[in-house]
Structure formats: structure tokens, C-alpha cells
Amino acid sequence: MSQPLNVAVVGATGSVGEALVGLLDERDFPLHRLHLLASAESAGQRMGFAESSLRVGDVDSFDFSSVGLAFFAAAAEVSRAHAERARAAGCSVIDLSGALEPSVAPPVMVSVNAERLASQAAPFLLSSPCAVAAELCEVLAPLLATLDCRQLNLTACLSVSSLGREGVKELARQTAELLNARPLEPRLFDRQIAFNLLAQVGAVDAEGHSAIERRIFAEVQALLGERIGPLNVTCIQAPVFFGDSLSVTLQCAEPVDLAAVTRVLDATKGIEWVGEGDYPTVVGDALGQDETYVGRVRAGQADPCQVNLWIVSDNVRKGAALNAVLLGELLIKHYL
């Protein structure tokens, strides 16, 4: 690897930021000095890293010329306010918020489209895709080498941690209220989420699509291009604290060789294929792991040209934080 860099993590006190900081430590990320940053409300807190305790600084006053790489794991408005400022100061940026258009900050995954970096110039301004897009594309990228996909349908069951710590707190609060037979007044969500499924995640636009559905659509298209054909995305809010669960159907041009599909999955690094007669779950398999789990590989009930997949992953650690760290490692090794 290249010489260690000074690195900043913006949004270090959030759930994804905290996981990202932990992975930098676990993976011995090649950094010289780590700066933890957050909004003024969180500045002054202390967080552990390696053998030390680091003070969280205020992103509004931070001089990005003092670091070579910054991970933006904060809210979208923070990235809109500071990502371009960081790049103008000579700092390469990996944004996890989805705030920046793909034409401005192209989504990049090491296992999917790392070659995209060759057409970019330092200092880089890149997006690390949202957890669902990352989990889906990691599984599809190797399969598309053998499958001629004409259409892709995705239904994603999102945990409340997709909304950060506040989502986790709200599900815990609602669950406690209901179990204690107390009246429930929803706060973060527009209706009860505990012991319930919500048919949409957040507000929808004039066509009925939510912001996260639009983001997944744009990022998957940017990562996989025309290899998947038309894409349809539905996101459901599930009463689960952590982890994503995806039901995926690929419509292919020819009957699908299921044995070939499972061979590819079994041979791909970062993917754990759970064989026939079993299936993976978020709680039982994926939480805290660095792999994406795939099961229930089967043909369509009335169409041998369809293949169905069940995908589960830790959305905070694997889907968001690890993909960004892997991208940072690649940048330092070859480009910075």
C-alpha cells in the first residue's frame, strides 16, 4: 500500500460512522491520523479508536486540506454542504449519503465496477452506494457474466436502522409501549411500525416512488448499466432493528441453469450461498458479518427463464460501512 494518509470520518457519531470507524481499526486501514467529525451538536464527544480516545470535531470549521481522504457518513445535507468544499481543498471524498448525483459522484464498488476509477482524477469525489444497491449488485455482478437478464424485480425489506439510531429507538419505544398495554402515538414513522409492515419507506413522489427506491434504481443502473434490463424496485419498512432482506427475480432470455447459478455464488468471495433445504436470515446469519448471504435459489413457478433469489446482509456494517472502507483501501493502494 501507499504511505498512510490523514483520514477524516464525517458523521462519526452515527450508526454507520461508528461502524466505519470500527472497521478502519479492525482492518488496520493505512492511516497516519484519524479525524472524527460531526455536527456542532455532537462535537466534543469522545470515541474509542485502537488504543486511544479521540475527540469529535465540528465539521463546519474543519480544514479539509489537512487530510487526504474523507468518508462522509452523515446526513445528505452535510454532504451537500461540505463534500465539494473538501474536494476543493485537495481531499478525496467517499460519500455514503446519496446526496450527490451519480454524474457528479459516480457510485463505485470494488467488486463490481472498480475500473470506473481509471476515468476519474484525484482528488476523487465518489459515492459508495446505499446498502440495498451494494448488496444486490455484489450478488448480481458475477451472475450477469452467465445470465442474459432482460428484467429485474426487487422487493427490499428494510430494517429501521436504515433511518439511523432514531429508527432503532422508535421501534424499541413502540414495542415497549405495546407490550405494556400503553396507548401508542407514532413519532418517526407515520404509523405503527412495531409488529407491522409499512408498504412504503418515507414519502413518495407524484409517480408513487420513495426517495430510497429512486436512489436504489439510480445506483444499480450506474453500477450495472444495461446488463440488467428494466429495473423495478419496491421498498418495505419492516419491524426489524438491523439488516436488509431482499427478494429478487431475474427474467432471463433463456431457461436458467440453476446449478451454474449456485456454482457462481459458491465461488464468489464475499458471498455465502446457503444450499438447498436451508435459507439465511438476518438475525441468524448476517448480523455482524462481512458477507452477503444468498439462499432460496429457484426457477419461476411457471417460467424456466426466471430465477429467484433471497439475499440478506447487515445493512450497517456490510452494506454501508465495509463497502466504503474497501473503496478507500483501493484508492490508497493504487490512486492516492
Curated annotation (Swiss-Prot):
GO molecular function ontology, one term from the record: NAD binding
SMART domains, sorted: Semialdhyde_dh
Listed NCBIfam families: PRK05671.1 (NF004224), PRK14874.1 (NF011456)
Protein name: USG-1 protein homolog
Family: Belongs to the aspartate-semialdehyde dehydrogenase family.
GO biological process: amino acid biosynthetic process
Organism: Pseudomonas aeruginosa (strain ATCC 15692 / DSM 22644 / CIP 104116 / JCM 14847 / LMG 12228 / 1C / PRS 101 / PAO1)
Organism taxonomic ancestry: Bacteria, Pseudomonadati, Pseudomonadota, Gammaproteobacteria, Pseudomonadales
SUPFAM superfamilies membership: Glyceraldehyde-3-phosphate dehydrogenase-like, C-terminal domain, NAD(P)-binding Rossmann-fold domains
InterPro entries for the chain: NAD(P)-bd_dom_sf, Semialdehyde_DH_NAD-bd, Semialdhyde_DH_dimer_dom
